[in-house]
UniProtKB/Swiss-Prot annotation:
<comment type="function">
    <text>Nucleotidase that shows phosphatase activity on nucleoside 5'-monophosphates.</text>
</comment>
<comment type="similarity">
    <text>Belongs to the SurE nucleotidase family.</text>
</comment>
<feature type="binding site">
    <location>
        <position position="8"/>
    </location>
    <ligand>
        <name>a divalent metal cation</name>
    </ligand>
</feature>
<keyword id="KW-0963">Cytoplasm</keyword>
<feature type="binding site">
    <location>
        <position position="39"/>
    </location>
    <ligand>
        <name>a divalent metal cation</name>
    </ligand>
</feature>
<dbReference type="GO" id="GO:0008253">
    <property type="term" value="F:5'-nucleotidase activity"/>
</dbReference>
<keyword id="KW-0547">Nucleotide-binding</keyword>
<dbReference type="Pfam" id="PF01975">
    <property type="entry name" value="SurE"/>
</dbReference>
<dbReference type="GO" id="GO:0000166">
    <property type="term" value="F:nucleotide binding"/>
</dbReference>
<dbReference type="InterPro" id="IPR002828">
    <property type="entry name" value="SurE-like_Pase/nucleotidase"/>
</dbReference>
<keyword id="KW-0378">Hydrolase</keyword>
<keyword id="KW-0479">Metal-binding</keyword>
<feature type="binding site">
    <location>
        <position position="91"/>
    </location>
    <ligand>
        <name>a divalent metal cation</name>
    </ligand>
</feature>
<dbReference type="GO" id="GO:0046872">
    <property type="term" value="F:metal ion binding"/>
</dbReference>
<dbReference type="GO" id="GO:0008254">
    <property type="term" value="F:3'-nucleotidase activity"/>
</dbReference>
<protein>
    <recommendedName>
        <fullName>5'-nucleotidase SurE</fullName>
        <ecNumber>3.1.3.5</ecNumber>
    </recommendedName>
</protein>
<feature type="binding site">
    <location>
        <position position="9"/>
    </location>
    <ligand>
        <name>a divalent metal cation</name>
    </ligand>
</feature>
């Protein structure tokens, strides 16, 4: 089994190091990750500037670009082979509910999925890397189970996994659940620059809004690992008919 590992926190982040160490003896692993933190870059690709790839002392390769850049470059020329699985993370903080739209961690996994390769994004629900090795063991066990069941042979899938920051023995079993929703983001933070200009900082994400039973928020709050299968199709299928009728009334 060949696995490509990436992330959005950068190639030196504890999460990607722990993930690599947990997977390196069950697969041939290659790390291609951003040079610097690229949180909230989603699926962004760098199109107006060249990208450079460097190799760190530990063998990790790092790119002067986004998480999606890293996976794109790796799959379309850098590796020279097609990996069986792409794993992204472990992210420093949750990627639940609406977070998945913005997440560079999910974006890296989604880039692989767009190329028809199975992919998993792993995140811890709290920042700070507490018990990151436990989250890495969760990743290892899930990857092993997926391989045992030969799911890598059945076409591409995209999974989003969020792990509570707990010791391994205190983690509750994986629950397969849907994405919840967050309240809208907090008000932007304004400051005055030394030149007297107003600066704006994006504030934190809103709290959980839809966190009922069956959501990723509910599962992780109860100590469970949350696993959500994702898809690319953004079509609002339920309202296609309504919009066809509306457009029809416009005439020619």
């Amino acid at each position: 089994m060949k696995i490509l590992i990436s992330n959005d926190d950068g190639f030196q982040a504890p999460g990607i190091v722990a993930l690599h160490d947990a997977l390196k003896d069950i697969a041939d692993v290659e790390v291609v990750a951003p040079e610097h933190n690229n949180s909230a870059k989603s699926n962004a690709l760098t199109l107006a500037a060249p990208l450079y790839v460097h190799k760190a002392h530990n063998g990790f390769r790092y790119v002067t670009g986004t998480p999606a850049d890293c996976v794109h470059i790796a799959l379309k020329g850098l590796l020279g082979y097609r990996p069986d699985l792409v794993v992204s993370g472990i992210n420093n903080g949750a990627n639940m509910g609406d977070d998945t739209i913005y997440s560079g961690t999910v974006g890296a996994a989604m880039e692989a999925y767009l190329f028809g390769i199975p992919a998993i994004a792993f995140s811890q629900i709290e920042k700070g890397w507490a018990h990151v090795d436990a989250a890495a063991q969760v990743a290892r066990r899930l990857v092993q189970q997926i391989e045992r069941e030969r799911m890598l042979d059945g076409g591409a899938f995209l999974l989003n996994v969020n792990v509570p920051n707990r010791p391994l023995q205190e983690l509750k079993p994986i629950q397969v659940c849907r994405l919840g929703r967050r309240h809208s983001a907090e008000k932007v933070i304004t400051q005055e620059s030394p030149r007297g200009e107003t600066m704006y900082w994006i504030a934190g994400a809103g709290g959980a809004k839809d966190s009922g039973e069956g959501t990723d928020f509910h599962a992780t709050a109860a100590g469970h690992i949350a696993l959500t299968p994702l898809q690319i199709d953004l079509t609002d299928h339920a309202n296609l008919g309504q919009w066809r009728e509306t457009v029809a009334r416009l005439g020619n």
